Amino acid sequence: MGPNGKPRKYLGVRYDLTQHEIARQNMKGLVEAIDKSYSTIEFDLTGTIQNANGLFLKTMGYSLEELKGKHHSMLIASSCYGTTEYRSFWEKLGRGEYDAGQYQRMAKGGREVWLQASYNPVLDDMGRPFKVILLAMDITGQKQAQVEVEKLIKAATAGQLSERIETESFHGASRELTESVNRLLDAVASPLHEAQTVLAALAKKDLTRSMS
């Protein structure tokens, strides 16, 4: 400042924000991509629900208001709550260790949902976990298709070759799987049925019957 109280010169400090802005935009894009592709839900270290995205809410049939502030245990079968395994699960996350796999969860109304998911502890600047984020994909259709295929194989092994999977309720890859299994069984069963017919005819001495 000059003697008259007016400024004589200005000091300017310029910060290069280019790299910071690039990093911010990259992170923003990553978060948006995850939000569009995965069901996500956030918990504190006690398992209390903090937030959830639209895909998770749609998958589980809840609104955010119905979930926020509630405990993770509302999303699991009642038989699992209070078990040693369930306590160990949250203790593990509290230590900052992630957990991944296929999880059976209960949606609104008791509907069974299967998730391919990972529970990821988030660390603060000191390396201490302070929350857990679940990233998940709904694989309920695949699991149901797997169950139906296993039932069909068991029936075929027992000689029930007329059994087929009702494919109308499946979509996408699950629909393709169940339809292909049905076609495979058709291909196997048809000549077997024909052979059974011929053998039955032979047993009756009807030698005019033959396999085409």
Give a label for each model feature:
Residues 1, 11, 99-104, 109-117, ...:
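PAS/PAC sensory module
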Residues 6-16, 128-138:
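PAS-family sensory domains
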Residues 19-36, 58, 65, 87-91, ...:
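Polar/charged heptad-repeat coiled-coil helices used as signal-transmission/dimerization stalks
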Residues 39, 85, 99-104, 211:
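PAS and PAS-like sensory modules
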Residues 40, 47-50, 174:
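Conserved hydrophobic beta-strand signature of PAS-family and PAS-like sensory domains
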Residues 46, 50-58, 70:
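PAS/LOV sensory domain surfaces, especially short acidic/polar patches at coil-to-helix junctions
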Residues 66-80:
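PAS-family sensory/regulatory domains
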Residues 120-122:
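Output-coupling edge of small sensory domains
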